Design a protein with these regions (language model features):
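Acetyl-CoA-dependent GNAT
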Residues: 8-11, 22-32, 38-116, 122-127, ...
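Short amphipathic helical patch at the helix-1/turn junction of helix-turn-helix
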Residues: 111, 145-146
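Conserved N-terminal entry element of GNAT/NAT acetyltransferase domains
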Residues: 1-15, 179, 185-193
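Hydrophobic "lid"/C-terminal helical patch
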Residues: 17, 21
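Short glycine/proline-centered loop/turn elements that form peptide/ligand docking sites
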Residues: 125, 148-151, 170-174
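Conserved catalytic-core motifs of GNAT/GCN5-like acyltransferases
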Residues: 141-144, 156, 161-178
Length: 193
């Protein structure tokens, strides 16, 4: 088991978050998204977006957490971004009130492949759940690519399941199917005195 921890992202993490996103997408999604789309993603553009997400979130419940691997040096190795569900979390044609208050949407949950299978994804998800619980959010949703077996397997192993919603993203005239997973945010465990 790796030595690691999760902490809130800092403004100076934005460039590293963008690098992790790009590296992970280029490995994990190479058979899902067109190669030229992955090759043309702009790391500087992504870094600016992550900087804004960290420094100017739309609400206090919008958060970016990072996973850190501790060795001789510390490395950022993954991240999770989430916030209250909005129109982006809806399926096509779904009414705007389909995801009621109290639902959080995970927009990104990535661990760089070379750091995978070391507990970072579980630590990120656990830390996020703790924050969702403290924000009073009772259900979580996440869109995953239909062809992303690793993410689906990870999330379903922790209790997530499809909620029946599906959509297809238009990525440079290629429709890429996604399905929405959901899970109840577990109540905080209380110990007996």
């Amino acid at each position: 088991m790796a030595l690691g921890y999760v902490r809130p992202a800092r403004p100076e993490d934005a460039g590293e978050i963008a690098r992790i996103q790009l590296a992970t997408w280029r490995v994990a999604y190479r058979r899902i998204l067109p190669r030229h789309v992955l090759d043309n993603l702009d790391e500087a553009f992504l870094a600016r977006r992550w900087s804004a997400a960290v420094q100017e979130p739309p609400s206090a419940a919008h958060r970016v957490l990072v996973a850190v691997e501790q060795a001789e040096q510390s490395y950022l190795v993954g991240f999770v971004a989430s916030g209250p569900a909005d129109a982006e979390a809806l399926a096509p044609g779904e009414p705007t009130d389909a995801l009621a208050d109290g639902v959080v949407a995970v927009t990104d949950l990535l661990v760089e492949p070379r750091w995978g299978r070391r507990g970072h994804g579980s630590r990120l998800l656990s830390a996020a759940v703790d924050q969702w619980r403290s924000d009073g959010l009772g259900r979580a949703v996440a869109w995953v690519f239909d062809g992303d077996e690793a993410t689906r397997k990870f999330l379903t192993s922790t209790g997530w399941e499809p909620d029946g919603a599906a959509r297809a993203l238009d990525v440079d005239d290629l429709l890429v199917p996604q399905l929405r997973l959901h899970v109840a945010v577990p109540a905080e465990e209380t110990g007996t005195p």
